[in-house]
Amino acid sequence: MEEVPRRQPGGLVEVEGVFQFYEDWECWDYVSQRVSDERLQRWLAMLTNNQLRRQVIREAQIWMWKHKGAAVRRNCGCRLCNPGWGSQVRNVEL
């Protein structure tokens, strides 16, 4: 039986950010279930601003490298399951 080819960092040509998207998603899925509530709420609030997305992923990667054996704290790290700072709709008066 053939083995599925594995992704190697920098070894494959990235097509329109597809590989980067999945790597970011896997990182977020892993980390968002394990970080403290305060850090998760901060990151969720930062994700409402598209310019801060790369910074959030970078911080998540650093956290993941430093805390390799971290225990799972929650089933889901999404904004719906973890309402807080980043969940409120912002009304802006112009």
Curated annotation (Swiss-Prot):
A Gene Ontology term for the protein's cellular component: virion component
This protein's UniProt keywords: Cell cycle, Host nucleus, Virion
Domain of life the protein comes from: Viruses
KW Cell cycle (keyword) present: yes
Cellular compartment(s): Virion; Host nucleus
Job of this protein: Seems to function as a Vpr-like protein, since it mediates host cell cycle arrest in G2 phase. Cell cycle arrest creates a favorable environment for maximizing viral expression and production.
Protein name in the entry: Probable Vpr-like protein
Species per Swiss-Prot/TrEMBL record: Maedi visna virus (strain 1514)
The encoding gene: tat
